[in-house]
């Protein structure tokens, strides 16, 4: 995804607003004087005179609008954290048992010292014990929005002849978490999502959602290793997922494993024997191959 940043004068600003008048969108960012979206490209004109175009067609739109493209700054790979950032991440989508936890967190540069003292890093490198110790501290200190989609609700929404698939449900959750966080008055300079699909695919699914915001998005693979805001979300989401997995296990009287390996097949077959399919509808993601594997184990 391309991000073009320009500095334009009052005359060009007036001309730009006229050109993009039919494509105007609302922006809750008090620093934004004008916002529009055309050809999949978000255009933000700040009161400072800074103009930002973000999207795969940013260069083409800049040329169409006769903007001084030669003076633009390419920021697609810029991961500077010296600005307020919202970062979002999800946990649980690769696990048969348990729901999906999605968290969006707002990290200001003034939070960096606190986070580094805690040892905040990619949650995938941290033990579950460490995550369970750090997460409550982060939840108390860092503005965030957490969402948990239970397995039961997941099974109602995801699958053949249902509203969502495994990708579009994550788009919906990330979008809603960020939207709700912005509704609290948060004003980030950048929003980063740990990339789980292409930008074009994300935007395709996003069209089906009711909640929208004008802020441009940055998609970064392994973003939790590059942005503290995403690392914070990863840790809080992991803790939320683990709590959910533990609670589901307590409800059923079984220890539910994380992941989608043979251990999940075995426990799933035990649950089928004890309670029937309703136990998996309550605790697992039914469209995973583990369901059929568990049924096969049961017949042996």
Swiss-Prot record:
A divalent metal cation binds at residues 89-90, 194. It is an enzyme of class 3 (hydrolase). It holds the Pfam family RNase_HII. InterPro entries: RNase_HII/HIII, RNase_HII/HIII_dom, RNase_HIII, RNase_HIII_N, RNaseH-like_sf, RNaseH_sf, TBP_dom_sf. Keywords: Cytoplasm, Endonuclease, Hydrolase, Magnesium, Metal-binding, Nuclease. It catalyses: Endonucleolytic cleavage to 5'-phosphomonoester. GO terms for molecular function: magnesium ion binding; RNA binding; RNA-DNA hybrid ribonuclease activity. Gene3D superfamilies: Ribonuclease H-like superfamily/Ribonuclease H, TATA-Binding Protein. GO terms for cellular component: cytoplasm; ribonuclease H2 complex. CDD domains: RNase_HII_bacteria_HIII_like, RNAse_HIII_N. Manganese or magnesium. Binds 1 divalent metal ion per monomer in the absence of substrate. May bind a second metal ion after substrate binding. One of its GO terms (biological process) is DNA replication, removal of RNA primer. Its cofactor is Mn(2+); Mg(2+). It is found in: Cytoplasm. Belongs to the RNase HII family. RnhC subfamily. Endonuclease that specifically degrades the RNA of RNA-DNA hybrids. This is Ribonuclease HIII.
């Amino acid at each position: 995804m391309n991000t073009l940043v320009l500095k334009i004068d009052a005359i060009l600003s007036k001309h730009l607003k006229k050109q993009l008048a039919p494509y105007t969108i609302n922006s809750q960012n008090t620093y934004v004087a004008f916002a529009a979206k055309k050809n999949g490209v978000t255009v933000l004109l700040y009161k400072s005179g800074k103009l930002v175009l973000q999207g795969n067609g940013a260069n083409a739109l800049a040329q169409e609008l006769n903007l001084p493209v030669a003076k633009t700054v390419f920021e697609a790979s810029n991961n500077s954290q010296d600005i307020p950032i919202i970062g979002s991440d999800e946990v649980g989508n690769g696990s048969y048992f348990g729901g999906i936890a999605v968290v969006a967190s707002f990290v200001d540069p003034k939070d960096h010292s606190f986070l580094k003292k805690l040892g905040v890093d990619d949650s995938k490198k941290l033990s579950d014990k460490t995550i369970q110790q750090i997460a409550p501290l982060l939840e108390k200190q860092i503005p965030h929005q957490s969402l948990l989609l239970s397995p039961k609700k997941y099974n109602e929404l995801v699958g053949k002849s249902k509203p969502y698939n495994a990708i579009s449900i994550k788009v919906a959750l990330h979008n809603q978490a960020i939207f709700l966080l912005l509704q609290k008055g948060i004003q980030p300079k950048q929003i980063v999502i740990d990339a789980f699909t292409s930008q074009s695919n994300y935007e395709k699914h996003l069209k089906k959602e009711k909640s929208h915001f004008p802020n441009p998005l940055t998609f970064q693979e392994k973003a939790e290793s590059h942005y503290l805001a995403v690392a914070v979300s990863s840790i809080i989401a992991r803790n939320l997922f683990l709590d959910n997995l533990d609670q589901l296990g307590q409800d059923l009287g079984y220890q539910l494993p994380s992941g989608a390996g043979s251990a999940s097949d075995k426990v799933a077959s035990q649950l089928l024997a004890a309670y029937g399919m309703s136990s998996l509808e309550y605790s697992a993601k039914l469209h995973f191959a583990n369901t059929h594997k568990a049924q096969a184990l049961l017949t042996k």
